[in-house]
UniProtKB/Swiss-Prot annotation:
Belongs to the zinc-containing alcohol dehydrogenase family. The keyword Ribosomal protein does not apply. Its EC number is 1.1.1.195. The gene is CAD6. Pathway: Aromatic compound metabolism; phenylpropanoid biosynthesis. SUPFAM superfamilies: GroES-like, NAD(P)-binding Rossmann-fold domains. InterPro entries: ADH-like_C, ADH-like_N, ADH_Zn_CS, CAD-like, GroES-like_sf, NAD(P)-bd_dom_sf, PKS_ER. This is Probable cinnamyl alcohol dehydrogenase 6. One of its GO terms (biological process) is lignin biosynthetic process. Expressed in the primary and lateral roots, and root caps. Expressed in the hypocotyl, cotyledon veins and hydathodes. In stems, expressed in the vascular cambium, interfascicular cambium and developing xylem. Expressed in the style, anthers, stamen filaments, vascular tissues of sepals, stigmatic regions in flowers, and abscission and style regions of siliques. Gene3D superfamilies: Medium-chain alcohol dehydrogenases, catalytic domain (3.90.180.10), NAD(P)-binding Rossmann-like Domain (3.40.50.720). It comes from Arabidopsis thaliana (Mouse-ear cress). The keyword S-adenosyl-L-methionine does not apply. Zn(2+) 1 binds at C51, H73, E74, C167.
């Protein structure tokens, strides 16, 4: 177990699991959280989902990791302390904390409720707070956050399965709304049936949208069609299937982070269709300009959502009974879970039971 030196006055001891280097191996870690500010809430972490980006950051695959690194940005918890100027929450409220915990609040993106695109947005973990301290994420017993960057969790939404909505859920909801891929007159393709993709199917169906899953894994067709309710399933490596579906989709949301060709996906789009990229692939894409010009097709990207939209998404999920398919794990299983995640061996999201299993790992 490790303890940070140079702890600031009025800080509060915290406990979690951290990686110390790019091996990505997590182990118990004692550190400090700042004192709760006037407009901040302290949140007792109950559950935290494991996002694929956690794995990327643990192993420094994006070359920006700051160690020690405590991951976790799919946080569900309970307000345990409030600052004297907090008006949004009360003690005991159930809340969610997603990928960002602050932004500049003055730029055009912030003024338009798109804090997620603020160039000075502060990540929930692996980011640097205004006071110069490193942010640690939700694989820990508590977290401090400005009330503006937490969302209310309705009592009708199961807490443990709500955790993945804070990243995977909003990542799918936002582009569907922004690019107009909602309603019975729309047909959306979702590439990849994993943590993001499976939630995307459920949001699409709740919007009344026709949805087709595109996957290289033939064995996922039954889950996509029978369990999640997708209207169609295409095997991306089956040339006949892909050819038959050409020009049928208004939009496609590509969740795959592994390197792959997007040219066949562009072929699935109708004229004026949009391919929206969510997966951060290591290698750049190689595409023909003619594949876009002939049909006025476009490629876009999307990343999570602003705080207002995240609350809207959570409320929509509660209203429509949308939840993630999860596997609940204990804190001491996290390294095994990371190994399984790297192999794609999860259906479809791991969630750590922080409140019931973290304390037992402290020696």
């Amino acid at each position: 177990m490790e303890r940070l030196s140079g702890e600031k006055e009025q800080s509060v001891e915290a406990f979690g699991w951290a990686a110390r280097d790019s091996s990505g191996h997590l182990s118990p870690f004692v550190f400090s959280r700042r004192k709760t500010g006037e407009e901040e809430v302290r949140v007792k972490v109950l559950y935290c989902g494991i996002c694929h980006s956690d794995l990327h950051c643990l192993k420094n695959e994006w070359h920006s990791s700051i160690y020690p690194l405590v991951p976790g940005h799919e946080i569900i918890g309970e307000v345990s302390e409030i600052g004297n100027k907090v008006s949004k929450f009360n003690l005991g409220d159930k809340v969610g904390v997603g990928c960002i915990v602050d932004s500049c609040r003055t730029c055009e993106s912030c003024r338009e409720d798109q804090e997620n695109y603020c160039t000075k947005a502060i990540a929930t973990y692996n980011g640097v707070h205004h006071d110069g301290t490193i942010n640690y994420g939700g694989y820990s017993d508590h977290i401090v956050v400005d009330e503006r960057y937490a969302v209310k969790i309705p009592h009708t939404l199961p807490l443990v399965s709500a955790a993945p909505l804070l990243c995977a859920g909003i990542s799918m909801y936002s582009p569907m709304k922004y690019f107009g891929l909602t309603g019975p007159d729309k047909h959306v393709g979702i590439v990849g049936l994993g943590g993001l993709g499976h939630i995307g199917v459920r949001f699409a169906k709740a919007f009344g949208t026709k949805v087709t899953v595109v996957s290289s894994t033939t064995g996922k067709s039954k889950d996509a069609l029978d369990t999640l309710g997708a209207d169609g399933f295409l095997v991306s490596t089956d040339e006949d299937q892909m050819k038959a579906a050409m020009g049928t989709m208004d939009g496609i949301i590509d969740t795959v982070s592994a390197s792959h060709s997007i040219s066949p996906l562009i072929g699935l789009l109708k004229s004026n269709g949009k391919l929206v990229l969510l997966g951060a692939t290591e290698k750049p894409f190689d595409i023909s300009a003619f594949s876009l010009i002939l049909g006025r097709k476009s490629i876009a990207g999307s990343g999570i959502g602003g705080m207002q939209e995240t609350q809207e998404m959570i409320d929509f999920a509660a209203e429509h009974g949308i939840k993630a398919e999860i596997e609940i794990i204990s804190m001491d299983y996290v390294n095994t879970a990371m190994d399984r995640l790297a192999k794609g061996d999860v259906r479809y999201r791991f969630v750590i039971d922080i409140s019931n299993t973290l304390a037992a790992t402290r020696s």
